[in-house]
């Protein structure tokens, strides 16, 4: 168990609200109305137009090659032929959800098959020819073409080049990724530096800097309290803490880093105590799917999380737990992917958290949901207002910073 050094005392009552209307809402609106500025800084713009088509072509090649190795050769099927299922003996049950998704990718991205209108899960071969270019050739031609996206391409190749083995179970994907220092770093770097994830994280840092500044100007009796859920290897943490400390607010905030992994929490504590000794940070184990700890109830001004909350069994339960941890004028700010990308299913589709939604009965048919669904669920959980980042670019619709705000009249149950 990792010892906690949190300065919030059990039973401590939250101080008075900042204003009659939370400043967090206006701060969020002001800084997040134009995603494209952050997108340009992070080099995220033009992704869908310039980069994604190459990624989709590579993903299709990985799937076609894997299916061929597992006994389903699409190129041998004639137009109008029924597309058989992969032989059940070749794919263990735990990968059946991913297989269903890969069939959808073949239909939606490659137009190689078309689903039956009368029978769910049944497909027919179309007249679109299978691209004969080997995945290895496509990968080599893509690597270095868009350097800011290479972390995704390298990680995709780690799994995609062995997709047949990963699907059949002959290759242990967890060992492939986490048992290799380079591959594990690729995954961590993707979450921290991939441009489309980086852009909303930049906006999150801006919002928190302004929020802490506004709070400290009128509240000298208590610090601004931030809780991070599912902080993992600390990619978001690092950016936020650095921005706050560079802005001179190291004494004006408390930051609680949490994760469900004892090892990750212990590692983060060593790392951040060394890198940011001036910051008021504490570290704790926290499973947001479980009933909240008593000492955390109604204690935080802002709760943040990056690509974590969707990976819970029941979003409605999780959002309700988040709400209970907030002060009456608090907010939750989530960086969440709101648009499907076919490569993502290969990169994270073998991780158990990607499919937890199937156990929770919260109405989802996929791990990710769009901003409108987030809004509906947040309001159902008791958040009075829900906002999200906007922009003119297609990239602004892909990974969003979504804010749920409590009104002062909301009572936390």
Swiss-Prot record:
Region (Methyltransferase (CMeT) domain), start-end ranges: 148-391
Signal peptide region: none
Domain of life the protein comes from: Eukaryota
Top enzyme class: transferase
InterPro entries: Methyltransf_12, Polyketide_Synthase, SAM-dependent_MTases_sf
Pathway entry: Antibiotic biosynthesis
One function term, GO molecular function aspect: methyltransferase activity
UniProt xrefs under SUPFAM superfamilies: S-adenosyl-L-methionine-dependent methyltransferases (SSF53335)
E.C. code: 2.1.1.-
Keywords: Antibiotic biosynthesis, Methyltransferase, Transferase
Annotated GO biological process: antibiotic biosynthetic process; methylation
Disordered: annotated span: 1-22
Family annotation (Gene3D superfamilies): Vaccinia Virus protein VP39 (3.40.50.150)
Protein task: Polyketide methyltransferase; part of the gene cluster that mediates the biosynthesis of sordarin and hypoxysordarin, glycoside antibiotics with a unique tetracyclic diterpene aglycone structure. First, the geranylgeranyl diphosphate synthase sdnC constructs GGDP from farnesyl diphosphate and isopentenyl diphosphate. The diterpene cyclase sdnA then catalyzes the cyclization of GGDP to afford cycloaraneosene.
Protein family according to the UniProt entry: Belongs to the methyltransferase superfamily.
Protein's name according to its UniProt entry: Polyketide methyltransferase sdnL
Gene source species: Sordaria araneosa (Pleurage araneosa)
């Amino acid at each position: 168990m990792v010892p906690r050094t949190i300065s919030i005392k059990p039973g401590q009552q939250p101080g008075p609200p900042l204003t009659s209307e939370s400043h967090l809402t206006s701060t969020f609106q002001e800084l997040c109305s134009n995603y494209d500025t952050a997108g340009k800084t992070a080099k995220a713009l033009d992704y869908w137009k310039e980069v994604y088509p190459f990624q989709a072509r590579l993903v299709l090649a990985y799937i076609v090659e894997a299916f061929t190795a597992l006994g389903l050769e699409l190129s041998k099927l004639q137009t109008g032929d029924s597309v058989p299922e992969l032989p059940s003996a070749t794919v263990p049950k735990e990968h059946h959800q991913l297989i269903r998704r890969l069939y959808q990718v073949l239909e939606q991205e490659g137009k190689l098959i078309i689903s039956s209108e009368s029978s769910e899960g049944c497909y027919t071969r179309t007249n679109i020819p299978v691209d004969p270019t080997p995945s290895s050739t496509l990968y080599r031609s893509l690597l270095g073409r868009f350097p800011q996206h290479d972390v995704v391409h390298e990680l995709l190749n780690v799994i995609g080049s062995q997709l047949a083995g990963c699907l059949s179970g002959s290759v242990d994907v967890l060992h492939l990724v986490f048992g290799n220092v380079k591959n594990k770093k690729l995954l961590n770097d993707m979450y921290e530096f991939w441009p489309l994830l980086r852009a909303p994280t930049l906006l999150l840092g801006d919002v928190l800097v302004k929020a802490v500044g506004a709070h400290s100007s009128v509240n000298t009796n208590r610090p601004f309290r931030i809780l991070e859920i599912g902080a993992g290897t600390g990619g978001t943490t690092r950016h936020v803490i650095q921005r706050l400390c560079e802005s001179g607010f190291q004494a004006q905030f408390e930051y609680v880093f949490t994760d469900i992994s004892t090892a990750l929490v212990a590692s983060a504590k060593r790392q951040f105590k060394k890198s940011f000794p001036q910051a008021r940070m504490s570290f704790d184990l926290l499973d947001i799917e479980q009933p909240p700890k008593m000492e955390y109830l109604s204690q935080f001004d802002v709760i943040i999380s990056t690509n974590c909350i969707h990976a819970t069994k029941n979003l409605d339960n999780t959002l309700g737990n988040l709400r209970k941890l907030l002060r009456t004028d608090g907010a939750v700010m989530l960086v969440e992917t709101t648009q499907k990308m076919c490569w993502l299913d290969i990169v994270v589709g073998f991780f158990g958290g990607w499919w937890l939604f199937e156990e929770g009965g919260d109405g989802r048919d996929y791990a990710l949901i769009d901003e409108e669904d987030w809004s509906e669920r947040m309001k159902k959980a008791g958040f009075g207002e829900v906002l999200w980042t906007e922009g003119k670019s297609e990239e602004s619709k892909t990974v969003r910073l979504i804010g749920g705000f409590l009104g002062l009249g909301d009572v936390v149950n």
